Protein backbone atom coordinates (compact mmCIF):
# COMPACT_ATOMS: atom_id res chain seq x y z
CA UNK A 1 0.00 0.00 0.00
CA UNK A 2 2.81 2.39 0.87
CA UNK A 3 4.42 1.73 -2.52
CA UNK A 4 1.11 2.59 -4.19
CA UNK A 5 0.91 5.85 -2.23
CA UNK A 6 4.48 6.74 -3.16
CA UNK A 7 3.79 6.01 -6.83
CA UNK A 8 0.73 8.28 -6.75
CA UNK A 9 2.70 11.08 -5.09
CA UNK A 10 5.49 10.81 -7.62
CA UNK A 11 2.99 10.88 -10.47
CA UNK A 12 1.43 14.02 -9.06
CA UNK A 13 4.76 15.76 -8.72
CA UNK A 14 5.72 14.74 -12.23
CA UNK A 15 2.99 17.05 -13.51
CA UNK A 16 5.25 20.09 -13.70
CA UNK A 17 7.79 19.28 -10.99
CA UNK A 18 11.49 18.86 -11.60
CA UNK A 19 13.56 15.85 -10.59
CA UNK A 20 14.86 17.61 -7.48
CA UNK A 21 11.36 18.24 -6.14
CA UNK A 22 10.43 14.62 -6.83
CA UNK A 23 13.53 13.43 -4.97
CA UNK A 24 12.69 15.56 -1.93
CA UNK A 25 9.12 14.26 -1.91
CA UNK A 26 10.40 10.69 -2.08
CA UNK A 27 12.75 11.35 0.84
CA UNK A 28 9.92 12.79 2.93
CA UNK A 29 7.71 9.83 2.05
CA UNK A 30 10.40 7.38 3.09
CA UNK A 31 11.00 9.21 6.37
CA UNK A 32 7.34 9.49 7.32
CA UNK A 33 6.89 5.71 7.06
CA UNK A 34 10.29 4.94 8.62
CA UNK A 35 10.76 2.18 11.17
CA UNK A 36 11.93 4.77 13.70
CA UNK A 37 8.34 6.06 13.92
CA UNK A 38 5.59 4.59 16.06
CA UNK A 39 2.43 3.25 14.44
CA UNK A 40 0.48 6.04 16.15
CA UNK A 41 2.67 8.72 14.57
CA UNK A 42 2.55 7.03 11.19
CA UNK A 43 -1.25 6.97 11.43
CA UNK A 44 -1.26 10.76 11.68
CA UNK A 45 0.41 11.14 8.26
CA UNK A 46 -3.07 11.25 6.74
CA UNK A 47 -3.93 14.31 8.84
CA UNK A 48 -0.62 16.20 8.82
CA UNK A 49 0.34 15.72 5.15
CA UNK A 50 4.13 16.01 5.53
CA UNK A 51 4.92 15.60 1.82
CA UNK A 52 2.61 18.38 0.69
CA UNK A 53 3.45 20.60 3.65
CA UNK A 54 7.24 20.38 3.50
CA UNK A 55 7.50 20.60 -0.28
CA UNK A 56 5.27 23.69 -0.14
CA UNK A 57 7.72 25.23 2.31
CA UNK A 58 10.55 24.42 -0.10
CA UNK A 59 12.47 21.96 2.06
CA UNK A 60 15.76 20.84 0.49
CA UNK A 61 18.18 18.20 1.86
CA UNK A 62 21.07 20.67 2.13
CA UNK A 63 19.25 23.31 4.18
CA UNK A 64 19.81 24.50 7.72
CA UNK A 65 16.35 24.12 9.29
CA UNK A 66 15.17 25.26 12.72
CA UNK A 67 12.07 23.53 14.09
CA UNK A 68 10.44 25.55 16.86
CA UNK A 69 9.09 23.80 19.97
CA UNK A 70 8.66 20.35 18.43
CA UNK A 71 6.50 18.84 21.19
CA UNK A 72 6.84 15.08 20.96
CA UNK A 73 8.92 15.35 17.83
CA UNK A 74 6.34 14.28 15.27
CA UNK A 75 7.84 16.44 12.52
CA UNK A 76 11.37 15.97 13.88
CA UNK A 77 11.01 12.31 12.94
CA UNK A 78 10.38 13.34 9.33
CA UNK A 79 12.87 16.18 9.06
CA UNK A 80 15.89 14.47 10.61
CA UNK A 81 16.30 11.71 7.99
CA UNK A 82 15.78 14.13 5.09
CA UNK A 83 18.48 16.50 6.40
CA UNK A 84 20.80 13.86 7.83
CA UNK A 85 23.41 13.68 5.07
CA UNK A 86 23.64 17.16 3.56
CA UNK A 87 21.77 19.56 5.82
CA UNK A 88 21.36 20.51 9.45
CA UNK A 89 18.29 20.19 11.64
CA UNK A 90 18.23 22.37 14.76
CA UNK A 91 15.47 21.58 17.23
CA UNK A 92 14.55 24.60 19.36
CA UNK A 93 13.13 23.31 22.60
CA UNK A 94 12.48 24.91 25.97
CA UNK A 95 15.48 26.00 27.99
CA UNK A 96 15.63 23.99 31.24
CA UNK A 97 17.90 26.61 32.83
CA UNK A 98 15.04 29.13 32.89
CA UNK A 99 13.23 29.03 36.22
CA UNK A 100 9.49 29.26 36.78
CA UNK A 101 8.28 27.41 33.68
CA UNK A 102 5.51 24.78 33.69
CA UNK A 103 6.81 21.30 34.52
CA UNK A 104 6.29 19.96 31.00
CA UNK A 105 8.87 22.43 29.72
CA UNK A 106 11.51 20.75 31.84
CA UNK A 107 10.44 17.22 30.90
CA UNK A 108 10.22 17.77 27.14
CA UNK A 109 13.96 18.41 26.56
CA UNK A 110 14.72 15.21 28.49
CA UNK A 111 12.31 13.22 26.33
CA UNK A 112 13.81 14.61 23.16
CA UNK A 113 17.34 13.81 24.31
CA UNK A 114 16.27 10.24 25.07
CA UNK A 115 14.56 9.98 21.69
CA UNK A 116 17.72 11.10 19.92
CA UNK A 117 19.91 8.72 21.94
CA UNK A 118 17.66 5.76 21.08
CA UNK A 119 18.16 6.22 17.31
CA UNK A 120 21.59 7.74 16.64
CA UNK A 121 21.51 6.76 12.97
CA UNK A 122 18.45 9.01 12.56
CA UNK A 123 19.14 11.82 15.04
CA UNK A 124 22.91 11.73 15.53
CA UNK A 125 23.47 15.00 13.66
CA UNK A 126 20.49 16.89 15.09
CA UNK A 127 21.46 19.95 17.14
CA UNK A 128 19.45 21.39 20.02
CA UNK A 129 18.88 25.09 20.66
CA UNK A 130 17.27 26.14 23.93
CA UNK A 131 14.55 28.74 23.48
CA UNK A 132 12.36 30.05 26.31
CA UNK A 133 11.75 33.73 25.61
CA UNK A 134 12.07 36.30 26.99
CA UNK A 135 14.79 34.92 29.29
CA UNK A 136 16.34 32.66 26.63
CA UNK A 137 15.41 34.41 23.41
CA UNK A 138 18.01 33.61 20.73
CA UNK A 139 17.65 30.90 18.10
CA UNK A 140 21.22 31.30 16.88
CA UNK A 141 23.36 33.61 14.81
CA UNK A 142 21.59 36.20 12.68
CA UNK A 143 21.10 35.10 9.09
CA UNK A 144 22.01 31.47 9.78
CA UNK A 145 18.86 29.51 8.84
CA UNK A 146 17.42 28.69 5.44
CA UNK A 147 14.08 27.59 6.84
CA UNK A 148 12.29 28.13 10.15
CA UNK A 149 9.29 25.90 10.84
CA UNK A 150 6.58 26.26 13.46
CA UNK A 151 3.75 23.77 13.69
CA UNK A 152 0.66 24.65 15.72
CA UNK A 153 2.42 26.92 18.22
CA UNK A 154 1.34 30.44 17.28
CA UNK A 155 -1.86 30.53 19.35
CA UNK A 156 0.25 30.02 22.48
CA UNK A 157 2.40 33.02 21.64
CA UNK A 158 -0.67 35.19 21.19
CA UNK A 159 -1.91 33.96 24.57
CA UNK A 160 1.39 34.83 26.21
CA UNK A 161 1.76 38.24 24.57
CA UNK A 162 4.99 37.09 22.91
CA UNK A 163 3.93 36.63 19.30
CA UNK A 164 5.55 39.78 17.90
CA UNK A 165 8.87 39.23 19.66
CA UNK A 166 9.04 35.58 18.62
CA UNK A 167 8.26 36.27 14.97
CA UNK A 168 10.85 39.04 15.00
CA UNK A 169 13.38 36.45 16.18
CA UNK A 170 12.37 34.18 13.30
CA UNK A 171 13.09 37.02 10.89
CA UNK A 172 16.42 37.76 12.55
CA UNK A 173 17.74 34.20 12.39
CA UNK A 174 16.68 33.63 8.76
CA UNK A 175 19.13 34.20 5.95
CA UNK A 176 18.13 36.85 3.40
CA UNK A 177 15.77 34.99 1.09
CA UNK A 178 15.07 32.39 3.79
CA UNK A 179 11.60 31.01 4.48
CA UNK A 180 9.32 30.86 7.50
CA UNK A 181 6.79 28.03 7.28
CA UNK A 182 3.76 28.23 9.56
CA UNK A 183 1.07 25.65 10.25
CA UNK A 184 -1.57 26.85 12.70
CA UNK A 185 -5.11 25.95 13.76
CA UNK A 186 -7.29 28.40 11.83
CA UNK A 187 -10.02 30.54 13.36
CA UNK A 188 -12.87 32.07 11.40
CA UNK A 189 -11.90 35.11 9.28
CA UNK A 190 -12.11 38.37 11.16
CA UNK A 191 -12.05 36.79 14.60
CA UNK A 192 -10.12 38.37 17.45
CA UNK A 193 -7.04 36.35 18.52
CA UNK A 194 -7.63 37.47 22.11
CA UNK A 195 -10.89 35.51 22.00
CA UNK A 196 -9.89 32.53 19.86
CA UNK A 197 -6.26 31.82 20.81
CA UNK A 198 -7.18 30.40 24.25
CA UNK A 199 -9.10 27.73 22.32
CA UNK A 200 -6.09 27.06 20.08
CA UNK A 201 -7.22 28.96 16.98
CA UNK A 202 -5.97 32.14 15.29
CA UNK A 203 -7.29 33.73 12.10
CA UNK A 204 -5.18 33.52 8.98
CA UNK A 205 -5.12 37.27 8.49
CA UNK A 206 -3.86 37.75 12.05
CA UNK A 207 -0.90 35.43 11.41
CA UNK A 208 -0.10 37.11 8.10
CA UNK A 209 -0.17 40.53 9.78
CA UNK A 210 2.05 39.21 12.56
CA UNK A 211 4.72 37.98 10.14
CA UNK A 212 4.55 41.15 8.09
CA UNK A 213 5.14 43.24 11.22
CA UNK A 214 8.33 41.23 11.67
CA UNK A 215 9.48 42.29 8.20
CA UNK A 216 8.65 39.06 6.39
CA UNK A 217 6.82 38.92 3.07
CA UNK A 218 3.74 36.72 2.71
CA UNK A 219 4.39 34.54 -0.31
CA UNK A 220 1.70 31.86 -0.52
CA UNK A 221 -0.93 29.83 1.32
CA UNK A 222 -1.79 26.17 0.84
CA UNK A 223 -4.92 24.26 1.76
CA UNK A 224 -3.00 21.00 2.20
CA UNK A 225 -3.97 20.97 5.90
CA UNK A 226 -7.44 22.43 5.52
CA UNK A 227 -10.41 20.63 7.09
CA UNK A 228 -13.90 22.03 6.38
CA UNK A 229 -15.42 19.63 8.95
CA UNK A 230 -13.80 21.57 11.81
CA UNK A 231 -16.50 23.82 13.32
CA UNK A 232 -14.13 25.38 15.92
CA UNK A 233 -16.84 25.55 18.60
CA UNK A 234 -15.86 22.80 21.00
CA UNK A 235 -16.11 22.73 24.77
CA UNK A 236 -12.39 22.01 25.17
CA UNK A 237 -11.22 24.02 22.17
CA UNK A 238 -9.07 22.46 19.49
CA UNK A 239 -7.93 19.83 22.00
CA UNK A 240 -11.40 18.28 21.75
CA UNK A 241 -10.32 16.91 18.36
CA UNK A 242 -7.73 14.24 17.61
CA UNK A 243 -5.07 13.57 18.61
CA UNK A 244 -5.84 14.98 22.09
CA UNK A 245 -9.51 13.96 22.34
CA UNK A 246 -9.70 15.59 25.76
CA UNK A 247 -13.39 14.71 26.15
CA UNK A 248 -12.40 11.07 26.54
CA UNK A 249 -15.15 8.70 25.43
CA UNK A 250 -17.77 11.45 25.28
CA UNK A 251 -18.77 11.92 21.61
CA UNK A 252 -15.49 10.28 20.65
CA UNK A 253 -16.82 8.93 17.35
CA UNK A 254 -18.09 12.39 16.40
CA UNK A 255 -14.76 14.09 17.01
CA UNK A 256 -12.77 11.29 15.43
CA UNK A 257 -14.92 11.61 12.31
CA UNK A 258 -14.10 15.34 12.13
CA UNK A 259 -10.39 14.54 12.25
CA UNK A 260 -7.59 16.91 13.17
CA UNK A 261 -8.16 20.65 13.02
CA UNK A 262 -8.56 22.99 10.07
CA UNK A 263 -5.08 24.48 9.66
CA UNK A 264 -3.61 27.30 7.64
CA UNK A 265 -0.31 26.53 5.91
CA UNK A 266 1.57 29.74 5.15
CA UNK A 267 4.91 30.53 3.54
CA UNK A 268 6.77 33.78 4.27
CA UNK A 269 10.10 34.94 2.92
CA UNK A 270 12.73 37.25 4.34
CA UNK A 271 13.58 39.90 1.75
CA UNK A 272 16.87 39.26 -0.02
CA UNK A 273 17.99 42.86 0.56
Model regions: which residues?
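A short glycine-rich, Lys/Arg-flanked "PGG" loop and its adjoining helix->strand segment in the class I
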Residues: 80-81, 163-176
Amino acid sequence: MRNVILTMIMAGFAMGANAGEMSVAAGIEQAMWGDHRSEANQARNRYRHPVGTLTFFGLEPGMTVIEIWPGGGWYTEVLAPVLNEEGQLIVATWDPSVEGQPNYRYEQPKRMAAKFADAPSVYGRVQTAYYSPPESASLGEAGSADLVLTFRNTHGWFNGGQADDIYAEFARVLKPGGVLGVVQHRAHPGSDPAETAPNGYVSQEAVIALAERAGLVFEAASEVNGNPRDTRDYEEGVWTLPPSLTMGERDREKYTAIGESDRMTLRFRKPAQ
